């Protein structure tokens, strides 16, 4: 258990925010997405010309929540530099690679994992058919966006994401998820 009190932890994140640093350090859900979107909007309103740094250590999470973050990243007039540290898996990988081209970084021991979206389905046969249609749309949309981010083909992304595919930081650079592997903040 951490010796930090919630107020101390909050003050650390507030100090980082003042430096235009946002941290995604958990699973992506609606609450986290709303918080990150609000932070991006606040910082871009304060100064639309200065970069925002988004540090990612996340196992992934909700596609819809992640897409809210992605859309806000693209909506913001400033560049969003992304940094993969620890784990950037699933939606974490997506957001890492969605950063501004040339400003996507991974620390040397980061692990990046890509896979196809997953979803639980239930209900009537008609409901399941609708959900399956939506799932197929989401899978294709995600593959197209990741292809755009990485320079890979949609077909290659679809093939490579059929199962969990793990990358070291260097492999992630070679694949196109990130532009740089860095060991020091001075390198970014």
Swiss-Prot record:
SUPFAM superfamilies: ClpP/crotonase. GO terms for cellular component: cytoplasm; endopeptidase Clp complex. Transmembrane segments: none annotated. It is found in: Cytoplasm. CDD domains: S14_ClpP_2 (cd07017). PROSITE patterns: CLP_PROTEASE_HIS (PS00382). One of its GO terms (molecular function) is ATPase binding. Coiled coil: none annotated. Its EC number is 3.4.21.92. Its main location: cytoplasm. GO terms for biological process: protein quality control for misfolded or incompletely synthesized proteins. Keywords: Cytoplasm, Hydrolase, Protease, Serine protease. It is an enzyme of class 3 (hydrolase). Belongs to the peptidase S14 family. Fourteen ClpP subunits assemble into 2 heptameric rings which stack back to back to give a disk-like structure with a central cavity, resembling the structure of eukaryotic proteasomes. HAMAP family: ClpP. This is ATP-dependent Clp protease proteolytic subunit 1. It comes from Corynebacterium jeikeium (strain K411).
């Amino acid at each position: 258990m951490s010796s930090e009190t919630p107020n101390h932890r909050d003050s650390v994140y507030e100090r980082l925010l003042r430096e235009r640093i946002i941290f995604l350090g958990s699973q992506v859900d609606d609450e986290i997405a709303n918080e990150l979107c609000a932070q991006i909007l606040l910082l871009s309103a304060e100064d639309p010309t200065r970069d925002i740094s988004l540090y990612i250590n996340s196992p992934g999470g909700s596609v819809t929540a992640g897409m809210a973050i992605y859309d806000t990243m693209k909506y913001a007039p400033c560049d969003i530099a992304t940094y993969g540290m620890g784990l950037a898996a699933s939606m974490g990988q997506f957001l890492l690679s969605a950063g501004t081209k040339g400003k996507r970084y991974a620390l040397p021991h980061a692990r990046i994992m890509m896979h196809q979206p997953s979803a639980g389905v239930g209900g009537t046969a008609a409901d399941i058919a609708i959900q399956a249609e939506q799932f197929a749309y989401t899978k294709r949309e995600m593959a197209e966006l990741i292809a755009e981010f990485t320079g890979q083909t949609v077909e290659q992304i679809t093939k490579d994401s059929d199962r969990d595919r793990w990358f070291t930081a260097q492999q992630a650079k070679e694949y196109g998820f990130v532009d740089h592997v860095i060991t020091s903040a001075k390198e970014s």
